């Protein structure tokens, strides 16, 4: 789903669609699998519900898992879609996934 893009990011394509909620969501099983593959260190017990950090165009945001989101879909609040090039959702878009260290930096800056 995601491939290496740079030292700080992976690149993938997801269907981007609006949600009525107030946070970014993706299917919970995909969220856990990506969390395990990208963010887990393999040292002891690790949480797999830690938010993923993604970037659409110029905006970073934490992504949480939800059972009601279709697979291969990124559900974003309307406010996050404003000012983007997403038209007529669901729209297949390139999305960046921050690597583990970059995600930690971004979450620390956001106070999450």
Located regions from the model:
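Long, compositionally biased stretches
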Residues: 1-112
